[in-house]
A protein has these predicted regions:
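Beta-rich catalytic cores
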Residues: 44, 51-52, 104, 111-112, ...
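Conserved core positions of repeat-based scaffolds
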Residues: 6, 54-57, 66, 114-117, ...
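Short glycine/serine- and acidic-residue-enriched loop/turn motifs that recur at repeat junctions
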Residues: 7-30, 68-90, 128-150, 188-212
Protein backbone atom coordinates (compact mmCIF):
# COMPACT_ATOMS: atom_id res chain seq x y z
CA UNK A 1 0.00 0.00 0.00
CA UNK A 2 3.04 2.25 -0.24
CA UNK A 3 3.39 2.89 3.48
CA UNK A 4 6.75 2.61 5.24
CA UNK A 5 7.42 0.95 8.58
CA UNK A 6 10.79 0.93 10.32
CA UNK A 7 12.02 -0.86 13.40
CA UNK A 8 15.20 -1.38 15.37
CA UNK A 9 17.38 1.31 16.89
CA UNK A 10 16.10 4.89 16.82
CA UNK A 11 18.78 6.84 18.68
CA UNK A 12 18.70 9.59 16.04
CA UNK A 13 15.06 9.32 15.02
CA UNK A 14 15.82 7.09 12.05
CA UNK A 15 12.54 5.20 12.59
CA UNK A 16 10.62 8.42 11.98
CA UNK A 17 8.34 8.12 14.99
CA UNK A 18 9.14 11.44 16.64
CA UNK A 19 11.15 9.84 19.42
CA UNK A 20 14.30 7.82 20.08
CA UNK A 21 12.66 4.65 21.36
CA UNK A 22 13.88 1.33 19.97
CA UNK A 23 11.11 -0.68 18.27
CA UNK A 24 10.91 -4.42 17.80
CA UNK A 25 12.82 -5.54 20.87
CA UNK A 26 9.74 -6.01 23.03
CA UNK A 27 6.41 -7.74 22.66
CA UNK A 28 3.48 -5.95 21.04
CA UNK A 29 5.57 -3.34 19.20
CA UNK A 30 5.14 -4.69 15.69
CA UNK A 31 2.18 -5.36 13.40
CA UNK A 32 -0.82 -3.09 13.82
CA UNK A 33 0.85 -1.56 16.88
CA UNK A 34 3.61 -0.05 14.73
CA UNK A 35 2.45 3.15 13.07
CA UNK A 36 3.68 3.82 9.53
CA UNK A 37 6.15 6.64 9.06
CA UNK A 38 4.29 9.88 8.34
CA UNK A 39 5.41 10.87 4.83
CA UNK A 40 2.91 13.72 4.46
CA UNK A 41 -0.76 14.10 3.59
CA UNK A 42 -1.77 11.52 1.00
CA UNK A 43 1.81 10.55 0.25
CA UNK A 44 3.11 7.01 -0.22
CA UNK A 45 6.58 5.68 -0.99
CA UNK A 46 7.91 3.95 -4.09
CA UNK A 47 11.47 3.27 -2.86
CA UNK A 48 13.45 3.39 0.37
CA UNK A 49 17.08 3.23 1.47
CA UNK A 50 18.89 3.45 4.78
CA UNK A 51 22.30 4.54 5.99
CA UNK A 52 23.74 3.60 9.32
CA UNK A 53 21.55 6.09 11.19
CA UNK A 54 19.33 7.73 8.55
CA UNK A 55 16.44 6.70 6.32
CA UNK A 56 15.44 7.92 2.86
CA UNK A 57 12.28 7.52 0.78
CA UNK A 58 11.18 8.45 -2.73
CA UNK A 59 7.55 9.46 -2.55
CA UNK A 60 4.89 8.73 -5.13
CA UNK A 61 5.33 12.23 -6.59
CA UNK A 62 9.06 11.72 -7.14
CA UNK A 63 10.17 13.89 -4.24
CA UNK A 64 12.66 12.63 -1.65
CA UNK A 65 12.44 12.86 2.13
CA UNK A 66 15.07 11.77 4.65
CA UNK A 67 15.14 11.55 8.44
CA UNK A 68 17.37 10.42 11.28
CA UNK A 69 20.97 11.44 11.90
CA UNK A 70 22.04 14.59 10.09
CA UNK A 71 25.50 15.30 11.48
CA UNK A 72 27.00 15.67 7.99
CA UNK A 73 23.98 17.08 6.15
CA UNK A 74 22.90 13.69 4.82
CA UNK A 75 19.24 14.71 5.16
CA UNK A 76 19.80 17.50 2.65
CA UNK A 77 18.07 20.22 4.63
CA UNK A 78 20.87 22.78 4.85
CA UNK A 79 21.50 22.08 8.52
CA UNK A 80 22.94 19.40 10.78
CA UNK A 81 19.84 18.98 12.96
CA UNK A 82 18.50 15.46 13.32
CA UNK A 83 14.94 14.85 12.11
CA UNK A 84 12.43 12.33 13.41
CA UNK A 85 13.61 12.25 17.01
CA UNK A 86 11.16 14.92 18.19
CA UNK A 87 7.47 15.60 17.80
CA UNK A 88 6.10 17.43 14.75
CA UNK A 89 9.18 16.88 12.58
CA UNK A 90 7.72 14.41 10.11
CA UNK A 91 4.83 14.44 7.65
CA UNK A 92 3.94 17.78 6.12
CA UNK A 93 6.42 19.45 8.47
CA UNK A 94 9.33 17.70 6.77
CA UNK A 95 10.24 19.48 3.56
CA UNK A 96 11.20 17.41 0.55
CA UNK A 97 14.87 17.64 -0.38
CA UNK A 98 15.59 20.24 -3.05
CA UNK A 99 16.94 18.23 -5.98
CA UNK A 100 16.96 21.17 -8.39
CA UNK A 101 14.39 23.00 -10.50
CA UNK A 102 11.79 20.55 -11.80
CA UNK A 103 13.84 17.51 -10.84
CA UNK A 104 12.51 14.32 -9.28
CA UNK A 105 14.22 11.08 -8.25
CA UNK A 106 13.94 7.60 -9.70
CA UNK A 107 16.32 5.85 -7.27
CA UNK A 108 18.02 6.54 -3.95
CA UNK A 109 20.93 4.97 -2.11
CA UNK A 110 22.54 5.64 1.25
CA UNK A 111 26.04 5.15 2.59
CA UNK A 112 27.09 5.45 6.20
CA UNK A 113 26.57 9.19 6.30
CA UNK A 114 25.81 10.22 2.72
CA UNK A 115 22.79 10.05 0.42
CA UNK A 116 22.66 9.58 -3.35
CA UNK A 117 19.82 10.22 -5.80
CA UNK A 118 19.40 9.24 -9.43
CA UNK A 119 17.34 12.00 -10.99
CA UNK A 120 14.70 11.76 -13.70
CA UNK A 121 17.12 13.13 -16.31
CA UNK A 122 19.76 10.48 -15.58
CA UNK A 123 22.03 12.73 -13.56
CA UNK A 124 23.30 11.79 -10.10
CA UNK A 125 23.52 14.02 -7.06
CA UNK A 126 24.99 13.15 -3.66
CA UNK A 127 25.16 14.95 -0.33
CA UNK A 128 26.27 14.41 3.26
CA UNK A 129 29.69 13.28 4.41
CA UNK A 130 32.47 13.68 1.87
CA UNK A 131 35.65 12.79 3.74
CA UNK A 132 36.81 10.39 1.01
CA UNK A 133 35.33 12.10 -2.04
CA UNK A 134 32.23 9.92 -2.05
CA UNK A 135 30.14 12.89 -3.27
CA UNK A 136 32.22 13.04 -6.46
CA UNK A 137 32.84 16.78 -6.39
CA UNK A 138 36.65 16.78 -6.46
CA UNK A 139 36.95 17.85 -2.83
CA UNK A 140 36.22 16.66 0.70
CA UNK A 141 33.66 19.28 1.67
CA UNK A 142 30.43 18.00 3.19
CA UNK A 143 27.25 19.03 1.36
CA UNK A 144 23.79 19.63 2.79
CA UNK A 145 24.77 20.84 6.24
CA UNK A 146 24.69 24.53 5.32
CA UNK A 147 22.20 26.75 3.52
CA UNK A 148 22.33 27.15 -0.26
CA UNK A 149 24.19 23.90 -0.92
CA UNK A 150 21.31 21.90 -2.38
CA UNK A 151 18.99 22.32 -5.37
CA UNK A 152 20.41 24.08 -8.39
CA UNK A 153 23.50 24.96 -6.33
CA UNK A 154 24.48 21.29 -6.12
CA UNK A 155 26.28 20.27 -9.28
CA UNK A 156 25.43 16.84 -10.67
CA UNK A 157 28.32 14.39 -10.54
CA UNK A 158 30.46 14.34 -13.68
CA UNK A 159 30.02 10.83 -15.08
CA UNK A 160 31.84 11.55 -18.34
CA UNK A 161 31.02 13.32 -21.60
CA UNK A 162 27.40 12.68 -22.54
CA UNK A 163 27.00 9.95 -19.95
CA UNK A 164 24.00 9.45 -17.71
CA UNK A 165 23.23 6.81 -15.08
CA UNK A 166 20.65 4.04 -15.00
CA UNK A 167 21.31 2.74 -11.48
CA UNK A 168 23.15 3.77 -8.32
CA UNK A 169 24.49 2.19 -5.15
CA UNK A 170 26.38 3.37 -2.08
CA UNK A 171 28.91 1.70 0.18
CA UNK A 172 30.02 2.95 3.57
CA UNK A 173 32.15 5.72 2.08
CA UNK A 174 31.80 5.15 -1.67
CA UNK A 175 29.27 5.67 -4.46
CA UNK A 176 28.69 3.66 -7.63
CA UNK A 177 26.72 4.19 -10.83
CA UNK A 178 25.79 2.04 -13.79
CA UNK A 179 26.04 4.27 -16.85
CA UNK A 180 23.77 4.35 -19.88
CA UNK A 181 26.37 2.45 -21.92
CA UNK A 182 26.45 -0.39 -19.35
CA UNK A 183 29.78 0.59 -17.83
CA UNK A 184 30.27 1.08 -14.09
CA UNK A 185 32.05 3.89 -12.28
CA UNK A 186 32.79 3.98 -8.55
CA UNK A 187 34.36 6.73 -6.45
CA UNK A 188 35.17 7.54 -2.84
CA UNK A 189 37.06 5.37 -0.35
CA UNK A 190 39.53 2.92 -1.87
CA UNK A 191 41.61 1.50 0.98
CA UNK A 192 40.91 -2.06 -0.14
CA UNK A 193 40.62 -1.60 -3.89
CA UNK A 194 36.84 -1.39 -3.78
CA UNK A 195 36.83 1.16 -6.62
CA UNK A 196 38.21 -1.52 -8.97
CA UNK A 197 41.03 0.59 -10.38
CA UNK A 198 43.90 -1.76 -9.56
CA UNK A 199 45.25 0.62 -6.95
CA UNK A 200 44.89 1.33 -3.25
CA UNK A 201 44.58 3.37 -1.13
CA UNK A 202 44.11 6.06 -3.79
CA UNK A 203 40.65 7.51 -3.16
CA UNK A 204 38.77 8.97 -6.13
CA UNK A 205 36.61 12.07 -6.11
CA UNK A 206 38.41 13.93 -3.35
CA UNK A 207 40.66 15.91 -5.70
CA UNK A 208 40.19 17.84 -8.92
CA UNK A 209 40.35 16.08 -12.30
CA UNK A 210 39.52 12.63 -10.94
CA UNK A 211 35.92 12.36 -12.16
CA UNK A 212 34.28 12.46 -15.58
Amino acid sequence: NGTVKAFGRSNYGQLGQGNTATIGDNANEMGDNLAPVDLGSGRTAIAVASGIYHSVAILDNGTVKAWGSNSYGQLGQGSSANIGDGANEMGDNLAAIDLGSGRTATAVAAGYYHTVALLDNGTVKAWGQNNYGQLGQGNTTNIGDNANEMGDNLTAIDLGSGRTATAIAAGLYSTAAVLDDGTVKIWGYNAYGQLGQGTSPNNIGDNANEMG
